[in-house]
Protein backbone atom coordinates (compact mmCIF):
# COMPACT_ATOMS: atom_id res chain seq x y z
CA UNK A 1 0.00 0.00 0.00
CA UNK A 2 1.14 3.53 -0.79
CA UNK A 3 2.13 4.98 2.59
CA UNK A 4 0.85 8.41 1.52
CA UNK A 5 -2.67 7.12 0.90
CA UNK A 6 -5.37 6.32 3.45
CA UNK A 7 -7.01 2.90 3.31
CA UNK A 8 -10.75 3.55 3.22
CA UNK A 9 -11.51 0.11 4.66
CA UNK A 10 -10.35 1.49 8.01
CA UNK A 11 -13.22 4.01 8.04
CA UNK A 12 -16.78 3.54 9.22
CA UNK A 13 -19.50 5.70 7.68
CA UNK A 14 -19.24 8.62 10.09
CA UNK A 15 -15.44 8.64 9.84
CA UNK A 16 -15.62 8.52 6.06
CA UNK A 17 -18.04 11.45 6.10
CA UNK A 18 -15.63 13.49 8.24
CA UNK A 19 -12.75 12.59 5.93
CA UNK A 20 -14.59 13.79 2.83
CA UNK A 21 -15.60 17.02 4.56
CA UNK A 22 -11.93 17.58 5.42
CA UNK A 23 -11.22 17.14 1.71
CA UNK A 24 -13.81 19.84 0.89
CA UNK A 25 -16.30 17.35 -0.51
CA UNK A 26 -20.06 17.24 0.04
CA UNK A 27 -21.05 15.05 3.02
CA UNK A 28 -23.57 13.04 0.98
CA UNK A 29 -20.70 11.66 -1.09
CA UNK A 30 -19.70 9.54 1.90
CA UNK A 31 -22.85 7.42 1.59
CA UNK A 32 -22.27 6.85 -2.10
CA UNK A 33 -18.63 5.92 -1.57
CA UNK A 34 -19.40 3.69 1.42
CA UNK A 35 -22.03 1.78 -0.55
CA UNK A 36 -19.75 1.36 -3.55
CA UNK A 37 -17.09 -0.20 -1.33
CA UNK A 38 -19.17 -2.47 0.88
CA UNK A 39 -22.53 -3.09 -0.80
CA UNK A 40 -21.44 -3.21 -4.41
CA UNK A 41 -17.96 -4.53 -3.77
CA UNK A 42 -16.04 -2.11 -5.97
CA UNK A 43 -12.51 -1.04 -5.11
CA UNK A 44 -11.67 0.78 -8.35
CA UNK A 45 -12.60 4.45 -7.97
CA UNK A 46 -12.90 4.80 -11.75
CA UNK A 47 -15.93 2.47 -11.68
CA UNK A 48 -17.81 4.57 -9.10
CA UNK A 49 -19.66 6.45 -11.81
CA UNK A 50 -21.99 8.61 -9.68
CA UNK A 51 -19.14 10.26 -7.76
CA UNK A 52 -18.02 12.65 -10.45
CA UNK A 53 -14.69 12.69 -12.26
CA UNK A 54 -13.05 15.31 -10.03
CA UNK A 55 -13.80 13.33 -6.86
CA UNK A 56 -12.73 10.06 -8.45
CA UNK A 57 -9.40 11.60 -9.39
CA UNK A 58 -8.97 13.01 -5.89
CA UNK A 59 -9.69 9.61 -4.35
CA UNK A 60 -7.13 7.98 -6.64
CA UNK A 61 -4.52 10.45 -5.42
CA UNK A 62 -5.34 10.43 -1.69
CA UNK A 63 -6.93 7.07 -0.91
CA UNK A 64 -6.89 3.37 -1.64
CA UNK A 65 -8.92 0.26 -0.86
CA UNK A 66 -6.17 -2.10 0.20
CA UNK A 67 -7.16 -5.73 0.81
CA UNK A 68 -5.36 -8.84 2.03
CA UNK A 69 -4.11 -11.07 -0.77
CA UNK A 70 -5.77 -14.44 -1.30
CA UNK A 71 -2.88 -16.91 -1.33
CA UNK A 72 -4.93 -20.10 -1.41
CA UNK A 73 -8.49 -21.36 -1.18
CA UNK A 74 -9.67 -24.76 -0.03
CA UNK A 75 -13.17 -26.18 -0.25
CA UNK A 76 -14.30 -28.99 2.02
CA UNK A 77 -16.46 -31.89 0.98
CA UNK A 78 -19.24 -30.36 3.10
CA UNK A 79 -19.07 -27.02 1.26
CA UNK A 80 -16.97 -25.17 3.82
CA UNK A 81 -14.51 -22.67 2.31
CA UNK A 82 -11.19 -21.67 3.85
CA UNK A 83 -9.05 -18.83 2.54
CA UNK A 84 -5.41 -18.25 3.40
CA UNK A 85 -4.90 -14.48 3.31
CA UNK A 86 -1.52 -12.80 3.15
CA UNK A 87 -1.16 -9.47 4.93
CA UNK A 88 1.12 -6.58 4.03
CA UNK A 89 3.52 -7.59 6.83
CA UNK A 90 4.00 -11.03 5.26
CA UNK A 91 2.04 -13.00 7.87
CA UNK A 92 -1.00 -15.03 6.87
CA UNK A 93 -4.38 -15.46 8.50
CA UNK A 94 -7.28 -17.78 7.78
CA UNK A 95 -10.95 -17.03 7.18
CA UNK A 96 -13.66 -19.69 6.97
CA UNK A 97 -17.16 -19.71 5.44
CA UNK A 98 -19.63 -22.35 6.62
CA UNK A 99 -22.75 -22.76 4.45
CA UNK A 100 -25.95 -24.20 5.86
CA UNK A 101 -29.46 -24.66 4.50
CA UNK A 102 -30.81 -21.34 5.72
CA UNK A 103 -27.71 -19.30 6.49
CA UNK A 104 -24.04 -18.78 5.77
CA UNK A 105 -21.60 -18.06 8.59
CA UNK A 106 -18.24 -16.37 8.11
CA UNK A 107 -15.60 -17.01 10.78
CA UNK A 108 -13.30 -13.98 10.95
CA UNK A 109 -9.83 -13.58 12.50
CA UNK A 110 -8.91 -10.62 14.72
CA UNK A 111 -5.18 -11.14 15.35
CA UNK A 112 -2.12 -12.67 13.74
CA UNK A 113 -1.71 -15.62 16.10
CA UNK A 114 -2.90 -15.50 19.70
CA UNK A 115 -1.25 -14.76 23.03
CA UNK A 116 -3.66 -16.65 25.31
CA UNK A 117 -2.16 -20.13 24.81
CA UNK A 118 -5.30 -22.22 25.32
CA UNK A 119 -3.96 -25.75 25.46
CA UNK A 120 -6.44 -27.31 23.00
CA UNK A 121 -6.17 -24.68 20.23
CA UNK A 122 -3.93 -24.86 17.17
CA UNK A 123 -3.69 -21.08 16.76
CA UNK A 124 -2.37 -20.66 20.30
CA UNK A 125 0.59 -22.95 19.64
CA UNK A 126 2.05 -20.47 17.17
CA UNK A 127 2.34 -17.52 19.52
CA UNK A 128 1.32 -13.94 18.79
CA UNK A 129 2.50 -11.37 16.27
CA UNK A 130 0.13 -8.39 16.16
CA UNK A 131 -3.44 -7.11 16.05
CA UNK A 132 -5.26 -6.79 12.76
CA UNK A 133 -6.36 -3.37 11.59
CA UNK A 134 -10.01 -2.56 10.98
CA UNK A 135 -9.25 -2.82 7.26
CA UNK A 136 -7.74 -6.29 7.66
CA UNK A 137 -10.77 -7.47 9.63
CA UNK A 138 -13.47 -6.02 7.38
CA UNK A 139 -11.34 -6.97 4.39
CA UNK A 140 -12.00 -10.62 5.23
CA UNK A 141 -15.73 -9.98 4.93
CA UNK A 142 -15.25 -8.01 1.70
CA UNK A 143 -13.16 -10.74 0.08
CA UNK A 144 -15.43 -13.58 1.20
CA UNK A 145 -18.48 -11.76 -0.16
CA UNK A 146 -16.66 -11.24 -3.45
CA UNK A 147 -15.45 -14.85 -3.71
CA UNK A 148 -18.90 -16.24 -2.87
CA UNK A 149 -20.68 -14.01 -5.36
CA UNK A 150 -22.14 -15.59 -8.47
CA UNK A 151 -20.86 -12.66 -10.48
CA UNK A 152 -18.13 -10.07 -10.37
CA UNK A 153 -20.45 -7.25 -9.40
CA UNK A 154 -22.72 -6.69 -6.42
CA UNK A 155 -21.92 -8.47 -3.17
CA UNK A 156 -24.58 -11.15 -2.72
CA UNK A 157 -26.22 -11.95 0.61
CA UNK A 158 -24.67 -15.38 1.07
CA UNK A 159 -23.02 -14.22 4.30
CA UNK A 160 -25.88 -13.97 6.81
CA UNK A 161 -23.84 -14.29 10.01
CA UNK A 162 -20.35 -13.30 11.13
CA UNK A 163 -18.59 -14.82 14.12
CA UNK A 164 -15.42 -13.33 15.56
CA UNK A 165 -14.11 -16.81 16.30
CA UNK A 166 -11.12 -17.05 13.98
CA UNK A 167 -7.48 -16.54 14.92
CA UNK A 168 -6.88 -14.38 18.00
CA UNK A 169 -8.71 -13.03 21.05
CA UNK A 170 -11.02 -10.29 19.70
CA UNK A 171 -11.23 -8.32 22.95
CA UNK A 172 -7.46 -7.85 23.00
CA UNK A 173 -7.92 -5.91 19.76
CA UNK A 174 -10.94 -4.06 21.07
CA UNK A 175 -11.10 -0.83 19.08
CA UNK A 176 -10.40 -2.33 15.66
CA UNK A 177 -12.77 -5.25 16.22
CA UNK A 178 -15.63 -3.02 17.38
CA UNK A 179 -15.04 -0.67 14.46
CA UNK A 180 -15.16 -3.57 11.99
CA UNK A 181 -18.30 -5.03 13.59
CA UNK A 182 -20.00 -1.64 13.34
CA UNK A 183 -19.31 -1.65 9.60
CA UNK A 184 -20.74 -5.17 9.36
CA UNK A 185 -23.96 -3.98 11.03
CA UNK A 186 -24.27 -0.74 9.06
CA UNK A 187 -27.25 -0.79 6.68
CA UNK A 188 -25.14 1.11 4.16
CA UNK A 189 -22.58 -1.71 4.21
CA UNK A 190 -23.37 -5.36 5.02
CA UNK A 191 -26.56 -4.77 7.00
CA UNK A 192 -26.19 -7.60 9.50
CA UNK A 193 -28.39 -7.43 12.59
CA UNK A 194 -26.87 -7.35 16.08
CA UNK A 195 -27.99 -10.94 16.64
CA UNK A 196 -26.13 -12.10 13.54
CA UNK A 197 -22.73 -10.80 14.62
CA UNK A 198 -21.15 -12.79 17.46
CA UNK A 199 -17.97 -12.07 19.37
CA UNK A 200 -16.28 -15.00 21.09
CA UNK A 201 -13.97 -14.33 24.02
CA UNK A 202 -11.98 -16.38 26.49
CA UNK A 203 -13.06 -13.95 29.18
CA UNK A 204 -11.12 -10.68 29.16
CA UNK A 205 -13.37 -9.08 31.76
CA UNK A 206 -12.52 -5.36 31.51
CA UNK A 207 -13.08 -5.43 27.76
CA UNK A 208 -16.25 -7.50 28.18
CA UNK A 209 -17.59 -4.67 30.33
CA UNK A 210 -16.62 -2.15 27.63
CA UNK A 211 -18.20 -4.25 24.90
CA UNK A 212 -21.44 -4.46 26.84
CA UNK A 213 -21.60 -0.67 26.91
CA UNK A 214 -20.70 0.11 23.30
CA UNK A 215 -21.77 -2.81 21.09
CA UNK A 216 -25.00 -4.83 20.98
CA UNK A 217 -23.53 -7.92 19.32
CA UNK A 218 -24.15 -11.46 20.51
CA UNK A 219 -21.66 -12.82 23.05
CA UNK A 220 -20.03 -16.25 23.19
CA UNK A 221 -17.70 -17.24 26.03
CA UNK A 222 -15.04 -19.91 25.55
CA UNK A 223 -15.68 -21.71 28.83
CA UNK A 224 -14.46 -25.30 28.32
CA UNK A 225 -14.28 -26.19 32.02
CA UNK A 226 -16.62 -26.00 35.03
CA UNK A 227 -13.97 -25.40 37.71
CA UNK A 228 -11.10 -22.97 38.17
CA UNK A 229 -8.61 -25.78 38.62
CA UNK A 230 -9.39 -27.32 35.25
CA UNK A 231 -9.95 -24.03 33.42
CA UNK A 232 -6.57 -22.73 34.63
CA UNK A 233 -5.05 -25.62 32.70
CA UNK A 234 -7.17 -25.33 29.56
CA UNK A 235 -7.67 -21.55 29.37
CA UNK A 236 -4.78 -19.88 31.25
CA UNK A 237 -6.38 -16.42 31.28
CA UNK A 238 -8.66 -17.89 33.94
CA UNK A 239 -5.81 -17.38 36.42
CA UNK A 240 -6.29 -13.64 35.96
CA UNK A 241 -10.06 -13.60 35.57
CA UNK A 242 -11.48 -16.60 37.50
CA UNK A 243 -14.85 -18.19 36.97
CA UNK A 244 -16.58 -16.39 39.83
CA UNK A 245 -15.89 -13.02 38.19
CA UNK A 246 -16.65 -14.28 34.68
CA UNK A 247 -19.99 -15.82 35.61
CA UNK A 248 -20.98 -12.77 37.65
CA UNK A 249 -20.55 -10.58 34.57
CA UNK A 250 -22.37 -13.06 32.33
CA UNK A 251 -25.38 -13.06 34.66
CA UNK A 252 -25.93 -9.35 34.08
CA UNK A 253 -24.51 -9.01 30.58
CA UNK A 254 -27.93 -8.82 28.92
CA UNK A 255 -29.86 -7.50 31.93
CA UNK A 256 -31.58 -4.87 29.78
CA UNK A 257 -32.55 -7.50 27.19
CA UNK A 258 -33.79 -10.44 29.28
CA UNK A 259 -34.64 -12.59 26.26
CA UNK A 260 -31.02 -12.67 25.08
CA UNK A 261 -28.60 -15.31 26.32
CA UNK A 262 -24.85 -15.76 26.54
CA UNK A 263 -23.53 -18.74 24.58
CA UNK A 264 -20.98 -20.84 26.45
CA UNK A 265 -18.64 -22.84 24.22
CA UNK A 266 -17.40 -26.10 25.67
CA UNK A 267 -14.91 -28.23 23.73
CA UNK A 268 -15.32 -31.92 24.56
CA UNK A 269 -11.98 -33.50 25.52
CA UNK A 270 -11.88 -37.21 26.16
CA UNK A 271 -11.36 -37.98 29.85
CA UNK A 272 -10.56 -34.34 30.65
CA UNK A 273 -13.80 -32.37 30.93
CA UNK A 274 -16.47 -34.72 29.59
CA UNK A 275 -17.40 -36.88 32.58
CA UNK A 276 -20.77 -36.89 34.43
CA UNK A 277 -19.23 -35.01 37.36
CA UNK A 278 -18.13 -32.26 34.97
CA UNK A 279 -21.70 -31.96 33.69
CA UNK A 280 -22.95 -31.68 37.27
CA UNK A 281 -20.39 -28.98 38.03
CA UNK A 282 -21.37 -27.09 34.87
CA UNK A 283 -25.05 -27.23 35.80
CA UNK A 284 -24.23 -25.72 39.19
CA UNK A 285 -21.96 -23.08 37.65
CA UNK A 286 -24.60 -21.87 35.19
CA UNK A 287 -27.46 -21.74 37.69
CA UNK A 288 -29.44 -18.53 37.16
CA UNK A 289 -27.29 -17.54 34.17
CA UNK A 290 -29.17 -16.68 30.95
CA UNK A 291 -27.21 -19.30 29.07
CA UNK A 292 -27.13 -21.71 26.21
CA UNK A 293 -24.32 -24.22 25.84
CA UNK A 294 -22.59 -25.19 22.63
CA UNK A 295 -20.73 -28.50 22.93
CA UNK A 296 -17.85 -28.69 20.46
CA UNK A 297 -16.30 -32.04 19.52
CA UNK A 298 -12.54 -31.55 19.76
CA UNK A 299 -10.80 -31.19 16.41
CA UNK A 300 -7.31 -32.70 16.61
CA UNK A 301 -4.13 -31.10 15.27
CA UNK A 302 -0.49 -32.26 15.16
CA UNK A 303 1.25 -32.86 18.51
CA UNK A 304 -1.89 -32.29 20.58
CA UNK A 305 -2.21 -34.21 23.83
CA UNK A 306 -6.01 -34.37 23.60
CA UNK A 307 -8.53 -36.67 21.97
CA UNK A 308 -12.15 -36.12 20.96
CA UNK A 309 -14.86 -37.40 23.29
CA UNK A 310 -16.98 -40.22 21.89
CA UNK A 311 -20.37 -39.46 20.40
CA UNK A 312 -22.02 -41.39 23.23
CA UNK A 313 -20.19 -39.34 25.86
CA UNK A 314 -21.11 -36.06 24.17
CA UNK A 315 -24.75 -37.07 23.85
CA UNK A 316 -24.94 -38.10 27.51
CA UNK A 317 -23.34 -34.82 28.58
CA UNK A 318 -25.82 -32.86 26.45
CA UNK A 319 -28.81 -34.81 27.74
CA UNK A 320 -27.85 -34.19 31.36
CA UNK A 321 -27.61 -30.44 30.79
CA UNK A 322 -30.92 -30.41 28.92
CA UNK A 323 -32.60 -32.36 31.72
CA UNK A 324 -31.67 -29.53 34.08
CA UNK A 325 -33.13 -26.86 31.83
CA UNK A 326 -29.97 -25.67 30.05
CA UNK A 327 -30.49 -25.22 26.33
CA UNK A 328 -27.65 -27.28 24.83
CA UNK A 329 -26.65 -28.16 21.29
CA UNK A 330 -23.75 -30.10 19.85
CA UNK A 331 -21.91 -28.23 17.13
CA UNK A 332 -21.66 -30.17 13.91
CA UNK A 333 -18.01 -30.39 12.90
CA UNK A 334 -17.52 -28.65 9.57
CA UNK A 335 -14.44 -28.34 7.38
CA UNK A 336 -12.21 -30.63 9.43
CA UNK A 337 -10.88 -32.25 6.24
CA UNK A 338 -9.24 -28.90 5.37
CA UNK A 339 -8.27 -27.93 8.95
CA UNK A 340 -11.04 -25.32 9.00
CA UNK A 341 -12.88 -26.64 12.05
CA UNK A 342 -13.02 -25.01 15.47
CA UNK A 343 -9.56 -24.84 17.05
CA UNK A 344 -7.71 -25.80 13.87
CA UNK A 345 -7.03 -22.40 12.27
CA UNK A 346 -3.33 -21.78 11.90
CA UNK A 347 -2.37 -19.34 9.15
CA UNK A 348 1.33 -18.52 9.01
CA UNK A 349 2.60 -16.44 11.91
CA UNK A 350 5.98 -14.82 12.49
CA UNK A 351 5.83 -15.39 16.22
CA UNK A 352 6.97 -12.47 18.36
CA UNK A 353 6.59 -14.58 21.50
CA UNK A 354 9.10 -17.23 20.25
CA UNK A 355 6.65 -19.97 21.12
CA UNK A 356 7.21 -23.45 19.78
CA UNK A 357 8.97 -22.88 16.45
CA UNK A 358 9.39 -26.62 16.18
CA UNK A 359 5.63 -27.04 16.51
CA UNK A 360 5.04 -24.69 13.60
CA UNK A 361 7.43 -26.61 11.33
CA UNK A 362 5.82 -29.94 12.16
CA UNK A 363 2.32 -28.52 11.84
CA UNK A 364 2.79 -27.13 8.35
CA UNK A 365 4.68 -30.24 7.27
CA UNK A 366 1.69 -32.28 8.39
CA UNK A 367 -0.71 -30.03 6.48
CA UNK A 368 1.35 -30.46 3.31
CA UNK A 369 1.44 -34.22 3.68
CA UNK A 370 -2.35 -34.36 3.77
CA UNK A 371 -2.25 -33.62 0.01
CA UNK A 372 -5.42 -31.56 0.23
CA UNK A 373 -5.54 -29.68 -3.06
CA UNK A 374 -5.01 -25.94 -2.82
CA UNK A 375 -6.64 -23.78 -5.44
CA UNK A 376 -4.41 -20.77 -5.94
CA UNK A 377 -6.39 -17.63 -6.71
CA UNK A 378 -5.01 -15.73 -9.70
CA UNK A 379 -7.61 -12.99 -9.42
CA UNK A 380 -6.19 -9.64 -8.37
CA UNK A 381 -8.61 -8.11 -5.87
CA UNK A 382 -7.01 -4.72 -5.29
Swiss-Prot record:
Intrachain disulfide bonds: 107-342
Top-level EC class as recorded in UniProt: transferase
Active-site residues annotated for this sequence: 94 (proton acceptor), 342 (s-methylcysteine intermediate)
Keywords: 4Fe-4S, Cytoplasm, Disulfide bond, Iron, Iron-sulfur, Metal-binding, Methyltransferase, rRNA processing, S-adenosyl-L-methionine, Transferase, tRNA processing
HAMAP family linked: RNA_methyltr_RlmN
PANTHER family assigned to the protein according to its UniProt record, in alphabetical order: 23S RRNA METHYLTRANSFERASE, RADICAL SAM CORE DOMAIN-CONTAINING PROTEIN
Note from the entry: Reaction proceeds by a ping-pong mechanism involving intermediate methylation of a conserved cysteine residue.
Protein name: Dual-specificity RNA methyltransferase RlmN
Provenance organism: Legionella pneumophila (strain Paris)
